[in-house]
Each structure stands twice: as C-alpha cells, then as structure tokens.
C-alpha cells in the first residue's frame, strides 16, 4: 500500500505470493496450481471464489453472514460426506459437486 516496488523474494517472504518460479516457468506453474485447485470439491471451490468476488463489495457483517451460509451449505453437501468417508477409508475423495 506504500507504492514501493518489491522483488519476488520479498513478496514471497511477506506472504503476498505463495510461490516464485524461474523465468519462463510461470505458465506451467499456473497450470499445476489450477489442477490442484480443480482436484478439490467443486462446490467448495465455487463458493470460495464467489465469496472472494463479493468480499470487497459488501460490509463485514454481510460478508460474515454469507460465509456462514456458505459453510452451512457445504457441511450438508454430499461432497462433505464423501470427504469424511474418504478420510476414514484412507483413500482419495471422489467429489461430484453435490
């Protein structure tokens, strides 16, 4: 917020970015990250993206209410039950987006 330019190492150190890659490897790194995100429960990922989009457009109390609503939807989802079953059975989850 100071307008001061920072380098990649400092951005990583302060948590502004979660990874620094060598020049020319950014597309492959982004593809790997996208695959990792896509492997998660689609309903949870979609709601998280929606909350991020809404976050800067609503006040804190509205955002917290929306987050609570999203959590209640997710906790009742088939994907939540599948995640718990997969953990108990020590296998990868098979999420369906329901």
Predicted segments, located by residue:
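Crotonase-fold acyl-CoA enzyme core
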Residues: 1-45, 68-69, 76-77, 81-85, ...
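Helix-loop "lid/cap" segments that line or gate small-molecule binding pockets
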Residues: 51, 55, 70-75
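A short structural micro-motif
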Residues: 54-55, 90-94
């Amino acid at each position: 917020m100071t307008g001061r330019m920072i380098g990649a190492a400092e951005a990583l150190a302060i948590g502004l970015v979660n990874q620094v890659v060598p020049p020319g490897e950014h597309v492959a790194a982004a593809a790997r990250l996208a695959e990792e995100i896509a492997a998660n429960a689609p309903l949870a990922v979609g709601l998280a993206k929606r909350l991020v989009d809404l976050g800067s457009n609503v006040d804190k109390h509205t955002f917290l209410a929306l987050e609570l609503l999203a959590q209640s939807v997710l906790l009742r989802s088939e994907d939540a039950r599948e995640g718990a079953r997969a953990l108990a059975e020590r296998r990868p989850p098979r999420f369906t987006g329901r």
